[in-house]
């Protein structure tokens, strides 16, 4: 199981590629990994914001790319997709930006 520090380092190393290929403006970890409550079966929750909208197919491609890169199942959401204010507040409390 990777640590939060290892995950952050991997994402930092690929930040330029994420920006160029997927138009990622910012990337943040939230959920169990951000709260240091992850288990062997935990996935990693990642929030992205982008410079320009990307298609659903590109978003799925990015989610798969990150899962392969981190060797952990990634649940990816975009900043613009959070409409429920309670969910948004809960996520924002955990965010660790890379």
Curated annotation (Swiss-Prot):
It catalyses: L-tyrosyl-[protein] + ATP = O-(5'-adenylyl)-L-tyrosyl-[protein] + diphosphate; O-(5'-adenylyl)-L-tyrosyl-[protein] + ATP = O-[5'-(adenylyl-(5'->3')-adenylyl)]-L-tyrosyl-[protein] + diphosphate. Mg(2+) 1 binds at residues 43, 45, 75. Its cofactor is Mg(2+). This is Putative protein adenylyltransferase MJ0126. Probable antitoxin component of a putative type VII toxin-antitoxin (TA) system. Neutralizes cognate toxic MJ0125 by di-AMPylation. Gene3D superfamilies: Beta Polymerase, domain 2. It comes from the Archaea. Belongs to the MntA antitoxin family. Signal peptide: none annotated. One of its GO terms (molecular function) is nucleotidyltransferase activity. Probably forms a complex with cognate toxin MJ0125. Its EC number is 2.7.7.108. Mg(2+) 2 binds at residues 43, 45. Binds 2 Mg(2+) ions. A motif (GSX(10)DXD motif) lies at residues 31-45. Pfam families: NTP_transf_2. Keywords: ATP-binding, Magnesium, Metal-binding, Nucleotide-binding, Nucleotidyltransferase, Toxin-antitoxin system, Transferase. It is an enzyme of class 2 (transferase).
